[in-house]
Amino acid sequence: MKKLNIGILSYRSAPFSGGQGIYVYEISKLLKELGHKVTVISGPPYPHLEKGIDLIKLPGLNLFSTFNFKDRLKKFLHKRPKSFDDYYEFFVALIGGFPEMKTFGNRARNLIKPEDFDVVIDNQSLAYGLIDIQQHTPILSVIHHPISKDKYFELLFSRSIIRRFFIKRWYGFLRMQKNVAKRMEYILTPSKNSQIDISNDFGVDKKKITIIPNGIDSNTFTPLNSREGFKNNFRIITTASADVPLKGLSFTLRAIHYLKDLYPEIHLTVIGQPKSGGYTERLIDELDISEYISFKTNLSKAEIAFEYACSSVAIVSSLYEGFGFPVGEAMACNVPLIATNVASIPEITSNYATLINKRLHLRYQML
């Protein structure tokens, strides 16, 4: 096998949340183990990487590390010298947009020269800059799922006209992603369902989209043995990699509210972090279930596996999953699984989970 010089682009790569940094860590590690030279080019927050993998930091303004206007203004004013992309990033964020993908793509285009890499892997930025890079270097565009699905579910659960206006403004980058996706020569996605949705939502020929399912580290995600600990019969676990409607955490919280009187010892562990003062925290207060819920974040793979293995039931209440890692991880740990019958989840579970009809799921949320 020919050894390649591979560049991996990731516009943001938080190592413990959102999935992007975790994906970059795993794919770069495995490509290096195959003997390839791997360089990750990332915007902030930056990923954790294995030794021997180069990291090129491509900083923007990192405005979304805070939502305080004074802090954002300070970041902008302290940037010296300023480029057009810095001005664009600041003012688009100021009016409620999300400019990071576009500006990261422009910076990557200016950085990468024809002789730098044999191939470039893009981790779902789908930025205009990729079109120029593709003129001299082959690009494999990884699309986990079309972000149009996130927009759809946010709008579905938003009744405020003002809120709906800002949701549409935030997802303004989708027009760019649709245009760029059509022009990418090679697209990779982890499930048949994502292939269909990318084709439908982004107008991409399915023949251009290759399906390679993500793998589960079965050396780490394993059943618990008696020497390591014990299962708690009233302990339920779920994962919410982002505090957004798409992940469906509110359904599980409402279920805990209903079950706590029947099973006073019940406890839900959530792998993830809610937004401070956000919808999830408000819902927990409204349902008066804070004593039954705990959140855990910044966990290693081994720590996550232990949390799964100690639980009696795992729940995946997502409304959409391009590839549901929590589904596969729970099954690998031999934990009984309840999951929504949506998107890629049935592809992963086959008959080995209790699947909940999405219509019943949504009807309960609307009550």
Regions found by a protein language model. Name each.
Residues 298, 306-311:
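Short alpha-helical donor nucleotide-sugar binding micro-motif in glycosyltransferases
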Residues 228-247, 253-256:
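Conserved donor-binding/catalytic core segment of Leloir-type glycosyltransferases
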Residues 336-339:
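Short hydrophobic beta-strand element within catalytic cores of glycosyltransferases
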Residues 319:
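Aromatic "clamp/platform" in nucleotide-sugar-dependent glycosyltransferases that forms part
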Residues 353-362:
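Conserved acidic donor-binding segment of nucleotide-sugar-dependent glycosyltransferases
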Residues 193, 215:
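Carbohydrate-associated surface elements
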Residues 280-302:
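Nucleotide-activated donor-binding/catalytic signature segment of Leloir-type glycosyltransferases, i.e.
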Residues 70-95, 134-178:
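Acceptor-binding helix/loop patch of EC 2.4 sugar-transfer enzymes
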